């Protein structure tokens, strides 16, 4: 399937972005949407060229593990990901206060395996010239390998990956060192108002749900982590029943199937991780975290939909993405940037985004401002959002962001790494091909009513949880229209 891509438009975007960056401390000229947009008219005259979407091949290993393989012959490179549907949200299923165990397990997976201690393992990676990493999110723990596809190199790289999966070292002295380093890092984070705001926001938003805690855990819980905790997490969750495998690069399908089967054979069997419960909606409130800073860091938002998995969900996601780009996308033509930064000078940047997760995501707007202006900045932000919801975004705003999204989407297919990342996301969440190859059509077919309806359905200002971190607690009793609980 092919879609149209304008190279000139990409050049224009790069030029505009570069100019904006170079002049970020100067007044940026906002587009007047009450007048015709010459740049949009000129684009109609630009000759467009074709690009080809990659073909995602789906199969399962002999043991039933889902695989997405994308054959790309341009580079002698192979990317492989093994992702497990069990991240830090499952920490408490190992031990009630074992918060951070998924993150630490991922950390230790690259610190020795089989007969290789940490130093030998790192030397083997360096000798092969490969990237072999592991990391955890709230929903998943993932391992990624990038290697040349030369037979000897790829064979040895796969052998190292299989040792990670089947014979992780989990050395006690290494664990103590990594705990010490993480605790030092967490102590530094305690001085970061953005970190404090994110932690307080997630705790208030998700309450007693497993999503309420940060993936790293906290200082006290990290101190308690033991090798037994790490092994228990690995044995319970890093199993074939929780796994998906994604392979991208210069291989035949037969080679990809062979590799997937080798990886699958390295995984123990067990009981598939249960689906997490849905979180309970939190009451709108203002939470202030005292912090010695002249700036106040602010997050405001609420629960939002989980990962989109159906065509109807994809439409809603696209429509809201367009609306949010116009309202809170972070560019100088986004309404919040224009009003809160350019006109009022409250902040250097303000940005809103949807964070989708397996059972419930969240929408949040983040910025910082001078402590004395915090109340006014929050009040002005709320006013801009209320106006967008009441009156909608304008047709010329939609045209601008629709063109932006149309010409940005092919960047998802611009490199092996970006294609692999997209395929990995699709594999983790069980998304059909239409998720990727239908986006341009969804953008082009989006009407102004569609986009404004998605905006109204997604952003609910009366449900906002507002977190402020700074010296002085702003009085927000008159900001929200509903009863506001101050803490």
Model-inferred region functions:
Residues 23-123, 144, 231-339, 465-487:
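His/Glu-rich zincin catalytic helix
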Residues 179-180, 275-285, 396-406:
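Short proline/glycine- and acidic-rich turn/helix-capping motifs at secondary-structure junctions
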Residues 161-170, 263-271, 383-393, 482-487:
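A common structural junction motif
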Residues 135-139, 175, 280:
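Short, glycine-/polar-rich solvent-exposed loops and beta-turns at beta-strand/coil boundaries
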Residues 33-35, 39-57, 203-243, 273-277, ...:
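Histidine-acidic residue clusters that define the catalytic metal-binding segment
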């Amino acid at each position: 399937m092919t879609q149209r891509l304008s190279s000139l438009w990409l050049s224009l975007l790069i030029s505009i972005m570069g100019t904006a960056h170079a002049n970020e401390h100067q007044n940026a000229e906002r587009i007047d949407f009450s007048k015709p947009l010459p740049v949009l008219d000129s684009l109609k005259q630009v000759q467009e060229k074709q690009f080809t979407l990659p073909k995602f091949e789906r199969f399962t290993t002999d043991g039933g593990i889902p695989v997405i393989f994308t054959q790309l012959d341009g580079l002698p490179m192979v990317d492989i990901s093994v992702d497990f549907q069990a991240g830090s949200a499952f920490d408490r299923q190992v031990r009630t206060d074992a918060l951070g165990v998924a993150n630490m397990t991922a950390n230790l997976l690259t610190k020795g395996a089989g007969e290789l201690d940490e130093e030998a393992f790192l030397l083997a990676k360096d000798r092969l010239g490969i990237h072999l990493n592991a990391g955890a999110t709230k929903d998943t723990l993932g391992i990624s390998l990038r290697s040349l596809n030369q037979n000897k190199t790829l064979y040895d790289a796969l052998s190292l990956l299989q040792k990670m999966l089947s014979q992780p070292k989990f050395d006690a002295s290494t664990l103590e060192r990594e705990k010490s380093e993480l605790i030092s890092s967490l102590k530094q984070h305690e001085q970061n108002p953005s970190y404090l705001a994110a932690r307080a926001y997630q705790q208030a938003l998700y309450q007693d749900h497993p999503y309420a805690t940060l993936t790293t855990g906290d200082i006290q819980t990290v101190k308690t982590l033991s090798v037994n905790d790490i092994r228990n997490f690995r044995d319970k969750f890093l199993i074939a029943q929780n796994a998906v495998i994604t392979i991208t690069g210069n291989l035949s399908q037969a080679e990809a199937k062979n590799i997937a089967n080798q990886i699958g054979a390295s995984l123990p069997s067990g009981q598939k991780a249960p689906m997490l419960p849905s979180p309970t909606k939190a009451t709108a409130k203002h939470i202030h975290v005292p912090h010695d800073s002249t700036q106040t860091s602010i997050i405001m938002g609420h629960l939002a939909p989980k990962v989109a998995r159906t065509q109807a969900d994809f439409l809603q996601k696209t429509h809201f993405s367009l609306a949010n780009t116009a309202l809170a996308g972070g560019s100088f033509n986004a309404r919040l940037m224009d009003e809160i930064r350019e006109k009022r000078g409250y902040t250097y940047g303000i940005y809103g985004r949807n964070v989708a997760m397996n059972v419930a995501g969240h929408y949040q707007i983040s910025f910082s401002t001078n402590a004395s202006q915090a109340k006014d900045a929050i009040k002005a932000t709320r006013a801009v959002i209320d106006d967008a919801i009441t009156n909608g975004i304008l047709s010329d705003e939609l045209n601008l962001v629709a063109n932006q999204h149309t010409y940005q989407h092919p960047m998802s297919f611009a490199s092996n790494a970006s294609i692999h990342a997209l395929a990995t996301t699709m594999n983790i969440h069980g998304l059909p091909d239409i998720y990727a190859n239908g986006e341009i059509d969804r953008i082009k077919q989006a009407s102004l009513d569609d986009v404004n309806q998605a905006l109204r359905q997604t952003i609910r200002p009366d449900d906002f949880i507002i977190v402020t971190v700074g010296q002085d607690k702003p009085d927000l009793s008159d900001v929200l229209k509903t009863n506001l609980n101050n803490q």
